[in-house]
């Protein structure tokens, strides 16, 4: 497994122990208690999810002869907290079932929207505009989440309408207002989103980007946002959310999750943990890393690169950190930890062009489902499962935890696209 280590860049370029980073000043944090207090204040807000918890299960891995190599067994009620070390026998990893957070919203999408949705309601947004691919889990999540709150969603999907609506595309169509956009026009996402948002808003409406309604905004945005909140109810208030919700605000949902998991009766604060997560845009992995760093946790994030190059993942990582520090000026960056060890960007076991399914992968997903009751998909979560399985073969000191980001509905789209892979399934 090829490993590439990331570098977290503090915005100031300097760091000693813990620091607050601000555009105007840098206030040193002298103790771990200070950093935890900052995180507590950061998370003292309204949330979209009623509770940050999702089920934690334990997957035992056994070597077998033949082409399958491994068999799996699921313990749906494992020992956690101090009991984890006592029950660690043989090869096993834990799986955080974020795929069970919502029947139609991917787990990682629910986390990314966790902090945004209450702000949308507080500022009386009437319409939300975003974009994604034809089978975008993000647009489906936005459509469902908006409909649940009585808001209108406008979804710009890349390419042409498929002959048969299924999977995330069907969910987006049922819950939101879908427009298919030619690839040439979609290439300039910012202009495309702004133009369509202006059309939705009309002459009397107002348009804002998601970053305009978060803390740390400048004076001009404050005035604009106040006007946005006080508008007459008859006027459209349109909010633009970037593709994939890959903004700094999305990191807050991961902060909330990490704080929850670091409780003593779950993973704890002192136990070494190797997290494994599939990386589409990489936002979830960065959120896990920054949150673990801020809380001083001895965790390592293994991000399996699926859709981009190492250079671009690192660029996105640096952008998110800079944006997060700008929007939340008290952001904590713990240089007491070796940041090169916080996130490891790694290749999946069988690299390929994104979107391609290799022979035998659908069969492996079926095997895992039948043996454990956990459904993974060959596009995303199978890659994380394979990496977690590989890690536990050699890992002795750390606990391995896979974050199941979801993707169940994606299987419907894949079954339509790769018909022979599914029709040839046999016992």
Curated annotation (Swiss-Prot):
<keyword id="KW-0496">Mitochondrion</keyword>
<dbReference type="GO" id="GO:0080146">
    <property type="term" value="F:L-cysteine desulfhydrase activity"/>
</dbReference>
<dbReference type="GO" id="GO:0019148">
    <property type="term" value="F:D-cysteine desulfhydrase activity"/>
</dbReference>
<dbReference type="Pfam" id="PF00291">
    <property type="entry name" value="PALP"/>
</dbReference>
<dbReference type="InterPro" id="IPR036052">
    <property type="entry name" value="TrpB-like_PALP_sf"/>
</dbReference>
<dbReference type="GO" id="GO:0009093">
    <property type="term" value="P:cysteine catabolic process"/>
</dbReference>
<comment type="similarity">
    <text>Belongs to the ACC deaminase/D-cysteine desulfhydrase family.</text>
</comment>
<feature type="modified residue" description="N6-(pyridoxal phosphate)lysine">
    <location>
        <position position="109"/>
    </location>
</feature>
<protein>
    <recommendedName>
        <fullName>D-cysteine desulfhydrase 2, mitochondrial</fullName>
        <ecNumber>4.4.1.15</ecNumber>
    </recommendedName>
</protein>
<dbReference type="GO" id="GO:0005739">
    <property type="term" value="C:mitochondrion"/>
</dbReference>
<keyword id="KW-0456">Lyase</keyword>
<keyword id="KW-0809">Transit peptide</keyword>
<keyword id="KW-0663">Pyridoxal phosphate</keyword>
<dbReference type="InterPro" id="IPR027278">
    <property type="entry name" value="ACCD_DCysDesulf"/>
</dbReference>
<dbReference type="InterPro" id="IPR001926">
    <property type="entry name" value="TrpB-like_PALP"/>
</dbReference>
<comment type="function">
    <text>Catalyzes the production of hydrogen sulfide (H2S) from cysteine. Can accept both D-cysteine and L-cysteine as substrate.</text>
</comment>
<feature type="transit peptide" description="Mitochondrion">
    <location>
        <begin position="1"/>
        <end position="45"/>
    </location>
</feature>
